[in-house]
Amino acid sequence: MGASFYNGYSPAERDAKYQVLVERIAIGEQPEAAGPCMLCGDPTSPVMYHDEDYSLPYLWESPALLVLCGNCHKDKLHKRFGRPPSHWYAFIAHVRRGGWASDIAKDAEIRKEVDRYRRALEAGEPFELRPLRPYIGVVGEEWFANLRLDEASKTDPAARPRP
């Protein structure tokens, strides 16, 4: 898999769980990843597994093992470390208004609106995103609500969901 540090887990720890996941899928103990995305809720985008928890014994359900669309997984979740926090917070506000990650990728007006929200957030100014779809999550209780955004959390053992 070629993993890097994440949530206080080493590349070796991450690779080990990934290999077990691949084996579980191959023998039918774990279903292939299927939507909707567990971050943005998009039911139409292709999805993949993402782990937040690599501790032993392995857990194979949410919130340890999640199903995410490619946009959420690669462009939002993992890139939250290399961008100002306002990028992540603007994306989460978009999700909470019923937005999908694919909306930002496909719709220039939505992309501009989220960017305006981000800039307003950075300036400490009010800006309200227009609702897109009903949001079924409980704000503040989602698995992604309190993720660390600091680069140090990648290697900090305290970032682990469990020891």
Predicted features, each with a name:
Residues M1-Y9, R83, H87-P163:
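Extended charged
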Residues P36-L68, R80:
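Histidine-centered nuclease catalytic patch
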Residues L65-Y89:
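Short Cys/His-centered divalent metal-binding micro-motifs
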Residues Y49-D51, N71, F144, K154:
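Intrinsically disordered, low-complexity peptide-like regions
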Residues G28-E29, K79, G124:
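Short loop/turn hinge sites at secondary-structure boundaries
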Residues Q30-D42, P84, V95-G99:
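Short, 15-30-residue, compositionally biased linear elements
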Residues M1-P36:
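Short, charged surface segments at domain edges that flank catalytic/cofactor-binding sites
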